[in-house]
Regions:
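Metal-dependent phosphohydrolase cores
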Residues: 1-167
Length: 167
């Protein structure tokens, strides 16, 4: 867990944007580095581990996207999971946290983070959103397969992502 925390903070330290110090302060004060996810990566530190796995996937499949946007989308896409559910999706809560920290997002970063779980046309028109969804599917599917031997779950996630890509 500490190694992933150090790697994430190292990546974020290389991003020179307004509000980054406030975001890092939020990450350290919240349960971002210690909590697990609800449906996958349930272990302590699972949320940060999942976000780092998504970052690693996205970096390996960058498709000409900026390294900074990849880091922002991957490492912050599930930031909203650090707050209680409020009837809105965690993508929207992630955007709210970043706004509260004064952290500006590009339109593509906003779309990718806010809609990474929805099926909409921007999956086809926003390469960052498409890559984030693929990375999220990859990390989630691999975790479920490894920890629960849910081959059908991993295959199902891959099949869904593949169907989106072929659309």
């Amino acid at each position: 867990m500490n190694q992933i925390k150090e790697q994430i903070l190292g990546i974020l330290g290389g991003i020179d944007r307004a509000g980054m110090d406030a975001v890092i302060e939020y990450l350290n004060a919240s349960n971002y580095f210690t909590r697990g996810c609800y449906h996958h990566h349930k272990e302590r530190g699972g949320l940060a581990k999942h976000c780092f796995e998504v970052y690693t996937f996205m970096s390996a499949h960058a498709e000409g996207l900026s390294a900074e946007s990849i880091a922002v989308a991957a490492l912050f896409h599930d930031l909203g999971k650090t707050r209680r559910r409020d009837g809105r999706g965690h993508g929207q809560r992630s955007l709210d946290i970043l706004k509260e920290c004064g952290f500006p997002l590009t339109p593509d970063e906003r779309t990718a983070i806010g809609r990474h779980h929805s099926v909409s046309a921007d999956f086809l028109t926003c390469p960052l959103r498409r890559l984030l969804t693929r990375g999220d599917c990859d990390s989630t599917g691999r975790w479920k397969h490894e920890h629960h031997n849910k081959k059908s779950s991993a295959e199902g996630v891959s099949r869904i992502c593949g169907r989106w890509e072929k659309s």
